[in-house]
Amino acid sequence: MAHLPVSPEKLIEQFGPHLNYPPREGFAGRDEPDKAVKTHCCFCGMQCGIKLLVKNDKVVGFDPWEEFPFNQGRLCPKGVQRYMQNNHPDRILQPLQRNEGVGFTPVSWDEAMDKTVAEIKRIQEKYGKNAFSVLSGVSLTNEKSYLMGKFARVALKTANLDYNGRLCMVSAGAGNKKAFGLDRTSNTYADLEKAEVIIVAGANISETFPTLTHWVWRARDHGAKLIVVDPRVIPLARTADLHLPVKPGTDSALYGAILKYLADHDMLDHDFIDNHTTDFDKALAAVKDYTLEWAEEITGIEKAKIELAAQWWGKAKTSFLLHARGIEHHSKGVDNVLGCINIVLATGRIGKPYCGYGTITGQGNGQGGREHGHKCDQLPGNRDITNPEHRKYIAGVWGIDEKDMPGKGYTAYELIEAIHRGEVKGLLSICFNPLVSLPNNNYVREALEKLEFYVCIDFFMNETARHADIILAGSLQEEEEGTVTTAEGRVVRIRKAVNPPGHARSDTSIILELAKRLGAEDKFTYRNSEELFNELRVASKGGTADYYGITYQKIEDTMGVFWPCPTLDHPGTPRLWEDKKFATPDGKAHFNPVTYRDPGEITDEEYPIILTTGRVVSQYLSGTQTRRIGKLVDLYPEPKLEIHPELARKYGIKQNELVQVSTRRGTDEFPANIVETIRTDTVFLPYHWPGKKSANQFTPATLDPVSKIPEFKVCACNLKPLGVISPPSTASGAYASI
């Protein structure tokens, strides 16, 4: 039903992506703006401070916001181009309806809303409430994240709600809650500055979080040793004291061996372990056979390097461990996270100045968006939807009977499987491009084609939206008031700079109108985002992610408040666990036993090479926004297959030669980029592109049993040179790949 109404080429011609560039002389009004609005960048969890320059209700440029304490005016390539979206020619300016053989045609808001509500009611009356589903996104503000969770459960009354954080931070979140009872980085990044040893595991921060690199350099200036764990020699690794080129999928073996080494050489904080933790004996028993020799065989890292890393970590007085998707995008991502946490707890270096642990959030509101209830298993305040007391409390805040609160629904990829089985017939998506972001995306496309009705809220027509029946023209971050939460746990203000262009509306107003037409108006009476936030504060009160003491005014006065902040007179909590009282029922941090197991997909004779995926500096997630910005596309026009010279020689592959990549799920071709900065048994593709240039046409849908995150980082493949040299990337048009 939700097939493309016309060819992809015609849709691209009509709605893009098209590239836009600023005029050489800058946009009119850049030098004499009406106002400079202090807000934040939308492109990663750092949420760097930035000033947007506005003239005649249009964003015409930016200035650095040097006073904001995290980035202090610094911006990455994406940050300096983020202002190019507001006036982009691809903006959706009015509601659109599928028109077979034509594409999409404009309709009035009443027509679009009437059609959407009628289809929701039809599907739910015919198949049941859970037959209609919602996929949300964590680039939404805290207010909109909260609103989407409430809308799905109160207005739609469906259990089937999930979000694209399921593809990002959920393994870290599950590990943090198991170990600490709370899901947040333990310290501000300023604590990095005087750490003696820093481990950066599976986090290409120089390209994906460039402004964070500053704090690592500050530590290096003070003599810190830097250890980088990554199968590639990422830019940060080129300057590191020690690079551990781990074989993709073997991270838990590395951290298990380090834990055993720390114990064997008595590099432990016995007082901390004895008085403030549990289950150290179980964690140690799980790794009793994890010798350095065994770890070398499993991980491919020389045992001398593993030993040196363990010695540096064990002997340090202060340390910081950071990780991101490189260890989390696995079918054992939660285990990898817990393996890292175990070596932090073993040395007792948490809850102290310059000692910390944290996961780096990749999406624009990756931290706040995973706290307030648009996950299938979560209620606001990071509460558990299966916990009777949690359900009762939130039902009271929402003014509904607890028995009317839906239960746990499907996670993002499970939802796609449910569509295939015919359980789910309708979908509303916002801020999510699953056709590019989910693994095995040909299967995802087939699911979209089985839907009876699909409505999308977005400001650009992304690849998934091309399958929609109705598209509702939504808003950019700077077109609404709100808050987001940085990767440090700092709640900051998003300030409205301009109105949505044309007949586009704010995301919030769209959802409120849908709720009204679905008969739930009395539960959605917010007049502005601050009223939404104030209800969120109450809903979070007493939860582990407690925002109750945070107000818009307090944020204005301080440039951000760190949660938990349980009372109005509480200053916030920049550094967790200083009192050694953890958020677990017994008040202690919990070690967790982690045993190594193979990835969900292993290499064999037919598919002997490991394919891993990741990001590049100029692109963001599925590329919906960044593949439309000319200067960002110029930096990296199309995905290339990174391959080591030794592996290239083995297969007879030349630089820029087209290479056929084959996996158990599909085959396509990419130009080769021969580099020495990758393991000899591994190739790399960035995942920001759709269609024939998509890395996720190859990735398996093997899910972590706890977090349900897909295994994006390990895929078995084979290579075949095609004997054709690829044309220059700038001429390829891959940014608009079908």
Q: What role is predicted for each listed range?
A:
Residues N99-P106, H265-K303, P380-D404, V498-T573, ...:
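N-terminal leader/propeptide and maturation segments of large enzyme subunits in energy/redox metabolism
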Residues I205-H214, P434-Y443, G482-T485:
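Glycine/threonine-rich flexible loop motifs
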Residues R232-P235, F460-R495:
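Flexible glycine/proline-rich, aromatic-decorated loop/lid segments
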Residues G314-E417, E488, D522, L568-G572, ...:
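A glycine-rich, hydrophobic/aromatic-adjacent loop/helix-cap motif
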Residues G369-C376, E531-K631:
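Long, low-complexity segments enriched in small/aliphatic residues
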